[in-house]
Amino acid sequence: MASKDYIFKMMAASSHSSDVREEHDFYSTEPKAVEDLLRYVDLQHKVTEPSCGNGNIANVLLSHGHEVDAYDLIDRGFGYTKDFLSDNTQIEGDIVMNRPYKYAMEHVSHGMSILKEGGKLCAFLKVQFLESQKRKPLFDAYPLKYMYVFRKRTNSYRNDDRSLGGSAVCYCWYVWEKGYTGEPTIRWID
């Protein structure tokens, strides 16, 4: 008989996980996922990463010549400490983030509110972020421009612990552009 963990993963029922969540929702981004984003999205020179964790996103951006303002609510040894949600300073350039899961909507909404016109916000999120009546006002206020879905699963690691293996979660890059008013375009990352 298959284990409970195996069955849930096969059903893609990640919301039924019996794993303990990381206290501050730190799930690091695979650097390859950021490389993939940069193949499709032309970012401005200056990029803010407001949930930098251990620097996986920022390091890829730096290696591509971007000037990166990287910070996090929790000091994880990279960037500096700052509370993104309580800072209303207008952002110069673009934002790239893998925000704490439980505050995803708040991070996207706040980021869009402090971006300059034409600035992009790229958020590494679950595909299921599209669902929910609760997020409808966010998508109404800030129409999504692009959604880049990974054809092959990419991972987000609790506390950057890669020994925990993969998951059945489907992630993608959501890309908003301040001032965009059209319909979203879905593209795939091979």
Where are these regions (language model features)?
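Class I S-adenosyl-L-methionine-dependent methyltransferase catalytic core
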Residues: 1-190
